[in-house]
Amino acid sequence: MQRICPAHCSVTHSLTMKSMRLSYIPPAASAAPQSPSYGRKKNASAAPPSAAASTTVLTSPLVTTTRTPKQTEQEDEQLVAKTKTTRTVIATTNGRAAPSQSRPRRRPAPAAAASAASLPMTFCNALEEVINTFIDPPALRPAVDPRNVLTSNFVPVDELPPTPCPVVRGAIPRCLAGGAYIRNGPNPQHLPRGPHHLFDGDGMLHSLLLPSPASSGDDPVLCSRYVQTYKYLVERDAGAPVLPNVFSGFHGVAGMARGAVVAARVLTGQMNPLEGVGLANTSLAYFAGRLYALGESDLPYAVRVHPDTGEVTTHGRCDFGGRLVMGMTAHPKKDPVTGELFAFRYGPVPPFVTYFRFDPAGNKGADVPIFSVQQPSFLHDFAITERYAIFPEIQIVMKPMDMVVGGGSPVGSDPGKVPRLGVIPRYATDESEMRWFEVPGFNIMHSVNAWEEAGGEELVLVAPNVLSIEHALEHMELVHSCVEKVRINLRTGVVTRTPLAAGNFDFPVINPAFLGRRNRYGYFGVGDPAPKIGGVAKLDFDRAGEGDCTVAQRDFGPGCFAGEPFFVADDVEGNGNEDDGYLVCYVHDEATGENRFVVMDARSPDLEIVAEVQLPGRVPYGFHGLFVTQAELQSQHQ
């Protein structure tokens, strides 16, 4: 099989000190010291509408007020014709040519806002430069040093319009035909000279539309687009970052100074925080006929993948009829039987956790504040059963005073805190029936699944336990996990724990039809080390107590790393077994620069690769993905 390396791009230097933009750094050169300033070329043609006039708030039922320009149906039809024409050009040694390795095109950056900056904007930009130059520490910690964080395949990429890709191995299974695999992840459009954490990049969706059964001969189509959050639009129009990020923008005195500059920008009308100041870079959810890009620091953003062209568009923030006024978890749970969606939000002010749900039509229910959480904690994920919701309270906490007094981050670990699991009836209207169970040393970032046993008297939770939680934000390469099965006896209050595997597994997925119900198999990314994923493992939970429960594993080879696997059930040719389906993910070869979409047989003892698609552009390492079926794509609300 021929392997093609994308053209390596060098880091370009700029005289401007406002921002820096990274091009792809080849692995061999990624460790070399970089210039503290990077240039970003601007297109001086037509400037798009300002951010204030180009965002959309979606409600449920659908009510739109102002903003993001949507493609018209005529534009979609033109794109269909253009994509189909392009597809005829691709041929390889097996009848198709390898895709072009030219760099993806970036949408033109507006020049008007930068060239005609107002006096208040100029003043605030100057203050940012003072902070960057004189207040930021001369040496940033590795976890927030952009020259350390954004190297190799963590370097951001440009947007990629819908581009055909050849299938270079096997054949796409019929159960995937016509659907799209979409992966979310951080991809900063600007990089400040100040600190930057991996979690803080703008969200970019990398969508691979697979050909439908009726379109024989067509190729899959890859499209990479930014989620156009209000923050993204404001900074795009400004030509530089203007809003601090949660994990890197509020460190020490410099963080407080940046907060003051943001306040000045708000008071002078440069931005409106009510439009949202957060990211949508973590995950995706398909619910009530809409596809959402999710991040904990803002409301969900409605996005759409065109079922014919593969184009990805942002349609605006969704407040669900004005009932969702703050952000929510990036890991909501959709009950596969009832169609309901369960979610929560957390924050630095009481109530530190609030639980809520949506009915199958997308109507949000009442908030249930959880006042028994007495300290602001980092609560990234949770679990549901048929009758309960389970909340983990871990040792990562919010500590604003550490930023003020110690010059540290407002988010850090508290080794003296005892982790707990909170159990509440999932249809509770208040927290009066909330029960907490101490589980020392049990720190989870992601849950696998939960269910009820013994007639509802016992709850079972499966999750990777982060054994070195103090490194989860600062030294991810030192993080190690052990997957555990935790059993909570609601009658006696006794909690028992059984280790299932100690292979540094995280980013778990299951067959989504079993969410909240007893299931047997889970699939995990294998840290090599974290945050890189060097392989995929399959665990059999029924083997609990027999030692290592790993029953299948695939390593992608030296220098090859993947993202989170996603399980797609085979509802076409399968026999209905839980593991009847396929695992899909993107894989990057750091030696050659080659990128693939990989399909693995979830039933095989070695997770056999049954199909590969060669991608025309680089897909950076990211977070969570989703497979959307052809029927779901076609039923998306406009």
Swiss-Prot record:
InterPro entries: Carotenoid_Oase (IPR004294). Induction: Induced by glucose. Induced by drought stress. Down-regulated by submergence. One of its GO terms (cellular component) is chloroplast stroma. Its EC number is 1.13.11.51. Belongs to the carotenoid oxygenase family. Residues 1-80 form a transit peptide. It holds the Pfam family RPE65. It is found in: Plastid, Chloroplast. It is an enzyme of class 1 (oxidoreductase). It comes from Oryza sativa subsp. japonica. This is 9-cis-epoxycarotenoid dioxygenase NCED1, chloroplastic. One of its GO terms (molecular function) is metal ion binding. Residues 28-37, 44-69, 92-102 have a biased composition (Low complexity). It comes from the Eukaryota. Has a 11,12(11',12') 9-cis epoxycarotenoid cleavage activity. Catalyzes the first step of abscisic-acid biosynthesis from carotenoids. GO terms for biological process: abscisic acid biosynthetic process; carotene catabolic process. Fe cation binds at H331, H380, H446, H624. Binds 1 Fe(2+) ion per subunit. It catalyses: a 9-cis-epoxycarotenoid + O2 = a 12'-apo-carotenal + 2-cis,4-trans-xanthoxin; 9-cis-violaxanthin + O2 = (3S,5R,6S)-5,6-epoxy-3-hydroxy-5,6-dihydro-12'-apo-beta-caroten-12'-al + 2-cis,4-trans-xanthoxin; 9'-cis-neoxanthin + O2 = (3S,5R,6R)-3,5-dihydroxy-6,7-didehydro-5,6-dihydro-12'-apo-beta-caroten-12'-al + 2-cis,4-trans-xanthoxin.
